[in-house]
């Protein structure tokens, strides 16, 4: 498995209490597999994504990314794993307002080092793959919400990750644009052999995913998504 979380527990102190954000969670995602995690606000979805991204260390359990067990690594080592093997699509695109679509991607490549010529070729290829051909010189204010989100996705793929983690990609989009973004994620997952995890509350955008998991009260279960909204 490209991404594997085993018996993950994540707790936080809250005064004289201990809050459990993740309660013995297991998750395994293979290359080319697109998994969606749905659940109400406060159910633990964001915590799950943060643990998978190596942004926070679980209280107990193990995290394996691209065959590397990262739970016991130093912060510097986890950062290298995240940079080299994980792409993250944040809920808000957070594009730099003064940069064109092409330059948004080139900034990522510059931070990682490598050949500027190869980076430019990679960036143009990615913009083509997310249906932004001819729009590489547009700035964020000149793009629609769907176009900005596609730049966000392309940016996450710039360093050729094996794991793609996606946080609420349709939250700022109407239904039609949201469906297009999720279909694009499914296509990119298969084309690039990615292990993709998307957390979402949008039950209307799940037709393109391979597996749907439900999170409630920090527990992850397969299948039944009834009551996801009402539970929140």
Predicted regions and their residues:
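Conserved beta-strand-loop-alpha-helix hinge in the C-terminal portion
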Residues: 219-232
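ABC family nucleotide-binding domain
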Residues: 2-3, 8-191, 196-216
């Amino acid at each position: 498995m490209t991404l594997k979380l085993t018996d993950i527990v994540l707790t936080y102190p809250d005064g004289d209490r201990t809050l459990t954000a993740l309660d013995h969670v297991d998750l395994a995602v293979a290359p080319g597999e697109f998994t969606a995690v749905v659940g109400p606000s406060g159910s633990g979805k964001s915590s799950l994504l943060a643990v998978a991204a190596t942004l926070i260390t679980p209280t107990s359990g193990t995290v394996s990314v691209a065959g590397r067990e990262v739970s016991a690594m130093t912060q510097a080592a986890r950062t290298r794993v995240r940079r080299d093997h994980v792409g993250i699509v944040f809920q808000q695109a957070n594009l730099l307002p003064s940069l064109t679509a092409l330059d948004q991607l080139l900034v990522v490549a510059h931070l990682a080092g490598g050949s500027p010529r190869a980076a430019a070729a990679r960036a143009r290829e990615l913009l083509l793959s997310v249906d932004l051909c001819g729009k590489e010189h547009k700035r964020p204010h000149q793009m629609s919400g769907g176009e900005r989100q596609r730049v966000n996705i392309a940016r996450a793929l710039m360093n050729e990750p094996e794991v793609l983690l996606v946080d609420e990609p349709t939250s700022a989009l109407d239904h039609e644009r949201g469906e297009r973004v999720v279909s694009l994620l499914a296509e990119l997952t298969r084309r690039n052999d990615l292990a993709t995890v998307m957390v979402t509350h949008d039950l209307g955008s799940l037709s393109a995913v391979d597996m749907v998991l439900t999170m409630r009260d920090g527990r992850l279960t397969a299948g039944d998504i009834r009551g996801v909204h009402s539970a929140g």
